[in-house]
Every structure is written in C-alpha cells, then in structure tokens.
Amino acid sequence: VLDFSYLADSRGNKPSLSIHDRDIKFLEPAFLDLEQKTGIYIDPYGTTRIYPAHQQILVDYLQGRSEDKIVEFVRLLKNAIREDEVLVADGD
C-alpha cells in the first residue's frame, strides 16, 4: 500500500489516499516521468515528499486517465496544489 497525506496534517483531518499494490502499476509511468524530469522518485516501499511543482508534473502526466484510483489521485494532487501543501507518499 502507498499512502498519500498532507505533510502538515498532524491531526488526520486533511484529505488522504491509499493506493493498493494492484493499482500502483497504473501510476508507475507517471512516477518514472517525474524521476526523469526532477530526479525525484516516488518509491512504493519508502517515504517521499512531493512538493507542489512535482505534483503538477504528475497531474500533467495523468490528466485524462479514467481509472478510478488515478482520478482520485489527481483530485488529491490538485487540492494539494491549490492549498500549496506538500504531500508525503509513505509505502510499505
């Protein structure tokens, strides 16, 4: 499972999203694109901070996809960008 949450969310009140291993495969190409453009890789088994500029790269790559989890992920990214929030990706 790869959990995405707001870095500043100490109370668990802000939006978050869990993506199971079977759905991560849909995001891997976007993660690789982000790595090629920035050197930042979202490791499904580690912890990564995703800053708003990096979030926008992911949105640009994933925009228009119709898989449910991708749509949810893009929605979370757009909210975080609008609120200028850093996301934390925490994998296991």
State where each predicted segment sits.
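Acidic (Asp/Glu-rich) sequence patches and key acidic residues
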Residues: 1-92
